[in-house]
Amino acid sequence: QKDIAETLGISRATVVNYLAEAREKELIRITLAAPAFITHRLAVELCERFGLTAAYVVPDEGADTEDQFARVTRGAALWLPDLLAAGDNLGVAWGRSVFDLAEALETTRTEDMTVLQLVGSMATPYGFTAEACSTRLAQRLGARCLNLHAPAILSSVELAQALRDEPIIRIQLDEIEKLNKLLFSVGTIKPDSHIMSAGLASMADLDHYVRRGAAGVICGRFVDGEGRAIDGPMEDRMIGIPLERLVGLPMGILVTPGHDKLAATM
């Protein structure tokens, strides 16, 4: 921006305004070169330690918590289109990280792609519900969207099973298991975490899972430090993809901004 301003003899603020207007009119698209982030020393170390295919590390120097969050979700939004291809069935979890990524995505078009909502609906005070995440992402990618039209959790095992047995719900559950790629984040196990505020888990539920070694939450289900599902009072009452179906996928795309998610992620 500085170089452009000096060359044209205008202020940097004017350059920023011109660029913003050009992006809104879809005259230009600004991207970051992925190699600059996947060859970062920390990215290389993460790949070596955890056996990852690639890691995209966004620097956080000089950024406060909100800025760090925004940098990571914007960086993930820039990289995501390069990871997708025609014919993909992209399974999508829910949460602020996923929703903000979708909001930051440039509108594009990928042929024959389907975005799958992996977790049922919930009563959350936030805007990033499961259906909002999948719908917004599909809109940005120009993809088909398959929403899961059922509650994420029911009051009883019997009611949950009855809903799963309904033909229309059964079809949707069968469809979401056709995913070949997964976009997700890891939730924390704090009392003010999203799984609590969304009404999926009670304090009694949280205590149960924490006592059994819970380290984080994936797709609304508690997992231990190795990413393994923990049995408890919620599993049979939930409607969504089973965690075992997420193991061994061709690609899992984890978006993890913020130091508060470090323990759950590692």
Residue positions per predicted region:
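Conserved phosphate- and dinucleotide-binding cores of soluble alpha/beta proteins
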Residues: 2-9, 14-20, 26-32, 122-266
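N-terminal active-site beta-alpha-beta segment that forms phosphate/nucleotide-binding
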Residues: 2, 7-8, 17, 31-157, ...
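Short glycine- and Lys/Arg-enriched binding-loop motifs that mark or flank ligand-binding interfaces
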Residues: 22, 87, 91, 223
